[in-house]
Amino acid sequence: MKLLNSVQNEAILSNVGEVGEFRIRNSAKAFSILSSGLYSNKIRAIIRELSCNAVDSHIAAGNASTPYDIHLPNTLEPWFSIRDYGLGLTHDQVINLYTTYFESTKTDSNEFIGALGLGSKSPFSYIDNFTVTAIKDGRKGIYTAFINEHGIPSIALMMEEETTDPNGVEVRFAVDQRYDFDKFRSEARFVYEYFSLRPVVSEIGRAHV
């Protein structure tokens, strides 16, 4: 989503002393607020934010009518995942996007939903680590995003290989709390009620849109 430039206010100052600019300190507290504190309903936010990213990637790739895939957690397969078939990401793009808050590739067009560069980090509101699989032009990179010992979000390349899989990105994380299985299901129903293009949802070997 294209962000409007804020109005430039000209302050008229006279007889002032030293002027200091406001800054944000690179700290675990700041990252916790940006990753988790923004969301009151964390499961709903994760589904919404990652799905918006998937839709935007499909639009950018010219695949706006192609559904993306999600997997809802259950007893036999206790994880959540979302896999798009959009542009995919190179190694440098993964490192840049996932380690820079407010970094977005979508600030110059109104065709896209997102723009703030926060949604890709939303899984940190629920869990301390998740997996990102990025496929781009025959290269597959598998990464682990995690909170390090200092409380700072980090990402590491775990494996890299050639592939014939279509471009796209998959985000996956474990859901250890069984009582959250039903909540993921109900929140997905709520979120996708407002999406014109529904994903393909898989659950215990069954798939539906």
Question: What feature does the model see in each segment?
Answer:
Residues K42, I46, G86, T90-V94, ...:
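Short amphipathic alpha-helical segments
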Residues S109-R206:
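GHKL-type ATPase core
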